């Protein structure tokens, strides 16, 4: 895949990347795409998948739970334990 295509994928928001990835999956599942084009869009799909995973990891790292005092007022944040 061309470097400019990878750079293009790195600029996409999560929503845009997942939307395009879903479109690629549908096209490949339909089976009406010529072989060479299938390979090309599959490669782009892989790059989109990696982008979505990267953005999800970043979001997960930023998620924090709000801590409160006895009266229920927010007192700060702490890392969210997702286990």
Curated annotation (Swiss-Prot):
Catalysed reactions listed for this entry: Exonucleolytic cleavage in either 5'- to 3'- or 3'- to 5'-direction to yield nucleoside 5'-phosphates
EC number of this enzyme: 3.1.11.6
Function: Bidirectionally degrades single-stranded DNA into large acid-insoluble oligonucleotides, which are then degraded further into small acid-soluble oligonucleotides.
Name of the featured protein: Exodeoxyribonuclease 7 small subunit
GO molecular function per UniProt: exodeoxyribonuclease VII activity
Quaternary assembly: Heterooligomer composed of large and small subunits.
Similarity-based family: Belongs to the XseB family.
Organism: Bradyrhizobium sp. (strain ORS 278)
Signal peptide location: none
A GO biological-process term: DNA catabolic process
Entry keyword DNA-binding: no
Subcellular location, record wording: Cytoplasm
Keywords annotated in UniProt: Cytoplasm, Exonuclease, Hydrolase, Nuclease
Enzyme class: hydrolase
One GO location term (cellular component): cytosol
Cysteine disulfide partners in this protein: none
